Regions:
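Mg2+-dependent endonuclease catalytic cores in nucleic-acid-processing enzymes, primarily RNase H-like
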Residues: 1-8, 23, 52-167
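Structural beta-strand/beta-sheet cores of well-ordered domains, especially the beta-sheet scaffolds
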Residues: 30-33, 40-42, 90-95
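Acidic, metal-ligating active-site segments
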Residues: 33-58
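A contiguous, basic/glycine-rich beta-loop/short-helix subdomain that forms a polymer-engagement track
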Residues: 1-33, 45
């Protein structure tokens, strides 16, 4: 898949399955979440992954609100803390959560830092990269006028490689 190319819609239609949104299909072994920050909202998705790179969209939410204010970030924190019901009846939490830091960067860093959870990662999209998820870059951010001794790490995420992997 070339950069800027969309996958063949017919291939995607042929891959569809019938399952209830918000539940994890039987083949789903682990859940990952990701969120994209915009000025007036955060769009968050939860995906289940199974054997052979099989994946299912479990849920997609649009959390409306000014991303310069705490309310929408609190909604994202609540979503991140949830678990989803597997077809077996088991409750599955997120194994990993990635937050795009390309917009509202400082607010996104603050969110990741406040989670105090190594499963939550800051990511920055790049057009090209050697790997889907690159080596993390340590950042040192000032917050409230104080220099942080240990900044969070930001991982690069290569969109072109993601298309090759998943389509």
């Amino acid at each position: 898949v070339e950069e800027g190319e969309a996958p063949d819609w017919q291939c995607l239609v042929e891959r569809r399955e019938d399952y209830r949104i918000g539940s994890v299909p039987a083949g789903g072994l682990l859940l990952v979440g990701g969120a994209d920050v915009q000025k007036d909202r955060i769009e968050a998705s939860v995906w289940a992954f199974g054997r052979g790179k099989e994946s299912w969209l479990v849920e997609h939410r649009v959390l409306m609100g000014d991303t310069a204010r705490d309310t929408v970030w609190n909604s994202l924190a609540e979503m991140r803390a949830e678990s989803w019901t597997h077809a077996s009846g088991a409750a599955l939490p997120l194994a990993r959560f990635a937050l795009d830091t390309g917009f509202a960067t400082q607010e996104a860093y603050t969110f990741v830092r406040a989670c105090r959870d190594p499963r939550v990662m800051a990511v920055k999209g790049v057009a090209r990269g050697a790997a889907l998820i690159g080596t993390p870059t340590a950042i040192d951010v000032s917050q409230g006028g104080k220099k942080l001794r240990r900044g969070i790490k930001v991982f690069s995420a290569a969109g072109g490689i993601a298309k090759l992997e998943f389509y």
